[in-house]
């Protein structure tokens, strides 16, 4: 009976393809197994920078949230008048200017009184 592991359909193993402990058999460097540690300090520095950056971003977001909480926001339900009396009081507080101040504005104006009236969408 034939051994199935030695069947002719299985690929042949070439010496160059044999890898032991993650390294090829031809590796003559006795420290090849430890070469991943070669750049360990650089890797640690990079990870530390990423952690500092994440912490900085987190602090920025926290400060931004605190500023938003401190800021006085316009809330219509709270800030707009609710009753007709409040609206009437605000309306009464409005000052109606007299016509003499309007005449002063016209006299001091730099506008051309002979200019055509501006109408949006009309080309002259």
From Swiss-Prot:
Sequence segments annotated as region (PABPC1-interacting motif-1 (PAM1)): 22-75
Chain spans, region PABPC1-interacting motif-2 (PAM2): 105-120
Keyword Cytoplasm among UniProt keywords: yes
Subcellular location: Cytoplasm
An annotated GO BP: negative regulation of translational initiation
UniProt xrefs under Pfam families: PAM2
GO cellular component, one term: cytoplasm
GO molecular function: mRNA regulatory element binding translation repressor activity
Secretion signal span: none
Record flagged with keyword Nucleus: no
Post-translational modification: Ubiquitinated, leading to its degradation by the proteasome.
Coiled-coil annotated residue ranges, if any: none
This protein's UniProt keywords: Cytoplasm, Translation regulation, Ubl conjugation
Free-text note on domains in this protein's UniProt record: Only the PABPC1-interacting motif-1 (PAM1) interferes with the binding of PABPC1 to poly(A) RNA and translation initiation.
Function text: Acts as a repressor in the regulation of translation initiation of poly(A)-containing mRNAs. Its inhibitory activity on translation is mediated via its action on PABPC1. Displaces the interaction of PABPC1 with poly(A) RNA and competes with PAIP1 for binding to PABPC1. Its association with PABPC1 results in disruption of the cytoplasmic poly(A) RNP structure organization.
Similarity section: Belongs to the PAIP2 family.
Subunit composition and interactions: Interacts with the second and third RRM domains and C-terminus regions of PABPC1 in a 2:1 stoichiometry.
Name of this chain's protein: Polyadenylate-binding protein-interacting protein 2
The organism of origin for this protein: Pongo abelii (Sumatran orangutan)
Phylogenetic placement of the source organism: Eukaryota, Metazoa, Chordata, Craniata, Vertebrata
Record gene name: PAIP2
């Amino acid at each position: 009976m034939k051994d199935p592991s030695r069947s002719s359909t299985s690929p042949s193993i070439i010496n160059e393809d044999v890898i032991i402990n993650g390294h090829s058999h031809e590796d003559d460097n006795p420290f090849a197994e430890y070469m991943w540690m070669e750049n360990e300090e650089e890797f640690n520095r990079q990870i530390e920078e990423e952690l500092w950056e994440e912490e900085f971003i987190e602090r920025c977001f926290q400060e931004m949230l605190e500023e938003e909480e401190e800021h006085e926001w316009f809330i219509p339900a709270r800030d707009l008048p609710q009753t007709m009396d409040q609206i009437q009081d605000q309306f009464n507080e409005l000052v109606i200017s007299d016509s003499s101040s309007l005449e002063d504005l016209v006299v001091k104006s730099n506008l051309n009184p002979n200019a055509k009236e501006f109408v949006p969408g009309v080309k002259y």
